[in-house]
Amino acid sequence: MYRPAIGRPRVLLVVSHPSVGAGLETIFRLERRYEVRRAAKLAEAASWARAWPADLALVDALLLRGGARANLGVPALVLAAGASEAAAAEQYVDKPGGWVAKDSAAADLVSAVERLLTRPAEASAGSLALFAIGALLVVLLALLLYLMWTAVA
């Protein structure tokens, strides 16, 4: 489940190519705003996701070829060569948050990560609201039954 970052946002990089991964890690570390971990495989990323809950994952589309799934439990940006590769890869991410081009400038990459980290959470009905609606329905049903009973009697 997505948790808004209280301290420094945690970014999990999932990139198989060592040089590309090191470059991305350097970009985020130079910002001095993020905690960064890097995984070279999806299985390693899933292990990191359990041990080190990230706020966002940046996943290389190449790792998602052949139907491999990235079930990381956090919003994920897909790092892709183009829109068609991104669209194909996003279906294999459990919480897609868009994509960023592999040839993006460092500032654009950081900006895409910031947009995803700061977007408002999806609204959902809380348990108290659901309980109140359920209680209201029970009361209305009881009232309807009472009115039907008094009309027959």
Predicted features by range, described:
Residues 121-153:
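C-terminal single-pass membrane-anchor helix
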Residues 73-86:
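A short, hydrophobic beta-strand element within the central beta-sheet of small alpha/beta folds
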Residues 83-99:
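Alpha4 helix (beta4-alpha4-beta5 surface) of REC/receiver domains from two-component response regulators
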Residues 104-113:
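C-terminal output helix
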Residues 58-62:
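Active-site residues of response regulator receiver
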Residues 8-19, 24-28:
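Conserved acidic segment of CheY-like receiver
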Residues 31-37:
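A generic structural motif
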